[in-house]
C-alpha cells in the first residue's frame, strides 16, 4: 500500500464515523503549496463555508501559502465564515493527514476564533 492509499483509507474510516454520528465536518486538505478547509453539512451534501490559501484575501495576509502561518490564516477565516452561517460546533476531519504542523495550526486558529471541536 502506498502512502496516498494509506491516507485515503484512514480518511474513509474517520468520515464513516462522522457520518454515523451526524456531525457537521470541518474538512482539511493539504498540498505542498496550499491548504484548503471546508465546513460540510451533516448530510454531506452541502458546503456551508470554505477558505483556502488560493483566495486573494488570504494571499494578501501571508507571504507564503505553504506554511503554518498561512494555515492559521485559513483557520481563522473558516471559523469566521462558519460562525456567520450559524455553525458553532463541528467535527474535525483531517482527511487522514497527521495532526501536526499546518493541520494543527489550522485547527488551533479555528478554535481560537470561536469554532468548537
From Swiss-Prot:
The answer to whether keyword Ribosomal protein applies is: yes
Gene3D superfamilies listed in its UniProt record: 3.30.420.100
Cellular component, GO annotation: cytosolic large ribosomal subunit
Q: Which UniProt keywords apply?
A: Ribonucleoprotein, Ribosomal protein, RNA-binding, rRNA-binding
Subunit structure of this entry?
Part of the 50S ribosomal subunit; part of the 5S rRNA/L5/L18/L25 subcomplex. Contacts the 5S and 23S rRNAs.
- What is this protein's function per UniProt? This is one of the proteins that bind and probably mediate the attachment of the 5S RNA into the large ribosomal subunit, where it forms part of the central protuberance.
- The name this protein carries in UniProt is Large ribosomal subunit protein uL18
**Species classification:** Bacteria, Pseudomonadati, Pseudomonadota, Gammaproteobacteria, Aeromonadales
Q: Which gene encodes it?
A: rplR
